[in-house]
Amino acid sequence: MLPRALYGDVSWQDALKSTLAAPSIKALSGGRTGDELFFVAAIVGAPGLWMEARESIRERDIVDAVEKSAVAFHAMFDTKIQYSISSEMSGETEILAVVCPIVSQEMSDSEQAFEAAAIDVQNAGKLLGLATAAAFGKWREDENVTLAKTRHVIVKSNREIPLFVDGERVNVGRTAEISFIPDAVNVMVPERIT
């Protein structure tokens, strides 16, 4: 997602060629939780465990994929996440997505905030409905999704919080703070993209 957002829908060879032909420096915002930086999204909650099963499938380790799928399915409705997005917006949910502006379809990449989505899927039927909406790009309109723009998120749980930043699992314990970083890193892009 990040390469496409930075360089467009081109091969890496074309992205490199156009960047070297007319280089420009772009400040890229991101997020931080603990010592971990991210530039695409942080996914908080047990449904993020499906990413580990997907990776096992990609590696063609079917036994591991089945085991990780079973863990993900069992934990999906057992792990509740308490969240605080602002003084006006807090609650409990199964999954919270914290999306950086550069990949959000609803925000300009120059916005100085995250797009946070609390996604409440209490049962498999609601999960299937949300997955169907997501397939058609309409997940933000689903009644089980609450959206907000924010620069800071706090999450808590009575269990170890499954938290993934840019697709990688990080250990955060039972509480985590996620903060927006306006100028997290400088990247080189083709001049026309800036």
Functional labels for PLM-detected ranges:
Residues M1-P101:
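Catalytic core of DAGKc-family lipid kinases
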Residues Y7, E52-E55, K68-M76, E106-A113, ...:
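Short low-complexity stretches enriched in small and charged residues
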Residues I25-A27, E92, E111-A113, V172-G173:
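A structure-centric signal for secondary-structure junctions around beta-strands
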Residues S90-K126:
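Active-site beta-loop-alpha substructure in enzyme catalytic cores
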Residues E111, A118-T194:
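ATP/nucleoside-binding phosphotransfer catalytic cores, i.e., glycine-rich phosphate-binding loops
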